[in-house]
């Protein structure tokens, strides 16, 4: 009688250990944040030439002064998309980009991820929204807003991924020093890389 009870006890202990190990792995996976993914844009989305360099120029200019996006949701949408694009493209070195890893120090890439998080928080956008979803929506909205099509812009940024007042939030972005600093640093990194290649 005791032998089968011991066998059942061993099975239960092993099952508990397995569940605990799985639980730890799930917690660690959650702490790591959303899985990074590829981020693609059409040529010329941020300007001519390399889209990484063009995006850095857009972001550095827009976020240096809140007045440059205040009341201008189209400009804000493109600038936020620029930060999103740079964070996704430069942080995951497994993807192919025109920019080698050595051109942008790891610390600068980490600061860019922090800046992306600050922007998402200011806009009421969750960390789980995919980078490609952000890019597609923001760039389409920027084009619609520039053409005066606010209804089209809202349709490009639908809930639940984006808050209902996303257009208003874009037009009232506060100055966020982490975003300004990260954008300027990345611009400097890419400028040095470009100069070195000439």
List the model feature ranges, each with a label.
Residues 19, 49-52, 165-166:
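Secondary-structure junction/capping motif
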Residues 2-20:
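Bacterial N-terminal signal peptides that target proteins for export
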Residues 32-35:
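Bacterial signal peptide processing site
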Residues 27-30:
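C-terminal motif of bacterial Sec signal peptides marking the signal peptidase cleavage site
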Residues 60-198:
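Mature extracellular/secreted ectodomains of secretory-pathway proteins
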Residues 39-65:
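Post-signal peptide N-terminal segment of mature Sec-exported envelope proteins
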């Amino acid at each position: 009688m005791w032998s089968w009870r011991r066998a059942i006890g061993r099975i239960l202990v092993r099952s508990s250990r397995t569940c605990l190990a799985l639980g730890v792995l799930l917690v660690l996976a959650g702490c790591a944040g959303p899985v990074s993914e590829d981020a693609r844009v059409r040529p010329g989305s941020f300007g001519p030439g390399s889209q990484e360099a063009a995006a850095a120029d857009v972001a550095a200019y827009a976020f240096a002064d809140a007045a440059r996006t205040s009341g201008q949701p189209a400009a804000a949408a493109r600038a936020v998309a620029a930060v999103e694009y740079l964070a996704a493209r430069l942080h995951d070195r497994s993807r192919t980009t025109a920019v080698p890893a050595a051109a942008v120090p790891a610390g600068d890439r980490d600061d860019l991820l922090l800046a992306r998080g600050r922007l998402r928080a200011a806009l009421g956008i969750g960390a789980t929204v995919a980078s490609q979803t952000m890019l597609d929506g923001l760039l389409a909205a920027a084009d619609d807003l520039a053409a005066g099509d606010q209804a089209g812009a809202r349709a490009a940024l639908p809930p639940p991924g984006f808050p209902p007042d996303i257009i208003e939030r874009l037009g009232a972005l506060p100055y966020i020093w982490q975003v300004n600093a990260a954008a300027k640093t990345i611009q400097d990194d890419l400028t040095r890389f470009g100069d070195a290649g000439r």
